[in-house]
Amino acid sequence: MLVAALGVLLYRDYVREADEPEPLAPAAAAPTEDDARREGFERAYARGQWGRNKQGKGSSGAGSTLESTRVYRVFLQDFLAAHEIRSVVDAGCGDWEFSRAMDWTGIDYLGLDIVAPVIEANRRRYGAANVRFAVADIVRDDLPPADLLLVKDVLQHLSHADIARVLAKLPRYRHVLIVNDVQQDSLSAAYQDIPTGGYRPLDLTQPPYSLRGAKVLAYRLGTNTKLVLHLQGDGGRAGGNGR
């Protein structure tokens, strides 16, 4: 009898446990805006959205080749010397296709990019005592101090909200050089908003931004013009160079 009763109890426990639902796995966290921004740029490189290099891997695009940056590189090299630049933060350094041809002697260079594999490759190929690379989201993260902040071909891929967050960080820099595509005919652009990771020409001297920095260089590339804007002193927000 005791054995039979024990068997009944064990059976009841088994049935009760079998009837209980399995605990649900914790729901995956919804992707944040920061996640979406990183994933957008990672996809661009993975798919070769902006072009591919000689090895067939996604690259920073036609605007970053040695040939297409010849005029810009001459300008930038002269700018570094003329303004006695000793430190540079390159916000959105990309795959360093053209920057490797620059002379960074005597300059502490830090290249930042949101795509980790790009930064890892740059470290292996180009890292030196005065040339460093780090993974960073220039929209979200604080940017290190430097004599010069470079922002080349980056803001044209950001939403208006993300552009505003980057521009808010400029006042700390003595010099800022911003490069974007603008329309050839008027050096202005359509200002529709885009999701970050997309693209549109962008002239920051036009509304809604109306930055009053100096237009120090303009050169043709394909169907667009590259415009280099120099913001000085307080990031271009006062003293005749501001918004």
Residue ranges and their predicted role:
Residues 148-161:
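A short SAM/SAH-binding and catalytic strip from SAM-dependent methyltransferases
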Residues 15-89, 94-146, 161-243:
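Class I (Rossmann-like) S-adenosyl-L-methionine-dependent methyltransferase catalytic domain
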